[in-house]
């Protein structure tokens, strides 16, 4: 049987990360920023609690320890709070992100693609222009499940984030949502966002947190990459000891 050495190592490291769950503390840059810093220090914990950030933090750390990179997505959800809108923070699957090869910082990539599987009927009801385009044209990596999950009634939605300079040369972040070759939304076609871009800060809404850094990549490698050979060696030694115990325990007849 396999030992739980690798699993226990990762579980203990995750427990250490949860014991050190961070809390926001905003310090003033100047004396006249004191009131603003105090206000932000009071507001940010509430925002994170409403976004269920502790669960997101836990999920990101599991992926960071196992896969080598934890990715947090920070978005604006206009449908939250009864249509008032609010910040949404989510743990993002690294396998569903695609960027320009060779960049060290994800913000240096001119384009960034985020893929997701969504129900085709629900998408068609929300975006009528998708009617008649139910055939999937993009495939995505999938985890292997014991219950044999089917994706026959789902379509791949591509969230395309890209940076382009405006007439003044300043990089603006834009966003295009596509599904089965149909444009569902484009910020450059939105009069409110065509000139200013999707977000005023002009950055991709994804934060990469690698465990062990790789050169020329925003992603890293994790403990499974480092410790799997040791786990295999432990299992082989355990198997050899079990065989010896079984052989030694057999009753001998003279």
Language-model segment annotations:
Residues 1-254:
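Extended alpha-helical, oligomerization-prone segments that build pores/tubes and scaffolds
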